[in-house]
Amino acid sequence: MNPRQNLDKQMLRIITGYAVGIVAAFLLGSMLGTQVVLASVQSMGLEVSWAARVDATLDDLLGLSATLLPVMALVLAVVWGLYDVIMTRMRSARGPYHYALVGGLCILALHPLLGAVLDVDVFAATRSWFGLLTQATAGAFGGWCCGRVRI
């Protein structure tokens, strides 16, 4: 394999890893976020059926793909890219758990920062610590998926 083919293969793996990680983080984050919001509706004494949960989850996946997905994609791609550059320059080993840590911390910081800058809760599920931690978990899962594909 010549150096050009090797570089092309490496770039494809990087792009695929980032894409898989972003989609995984978004899907899990959207689904968990919907369930957090529905749990708070249920805590007010309203009944939420499984059919309503499935409907709301599907609606949110579609609706949030225009708002949450682009924000997560931009932030995660930039942070994972910076992580890759730093680790390459330091000649340090990378692992799926490192990408998970970076992704989780990134999303954990993202929502409060957006709230502070825009003076509004961008994603209702992150109004509570539990909701924010579910989103960080989604970012960590996306990072783990990214790392598994990348390495």
What residues fall within each predicted segment?
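Juxtamembrane/disordered regions of integral membrane proteins
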Residues: N2-I151
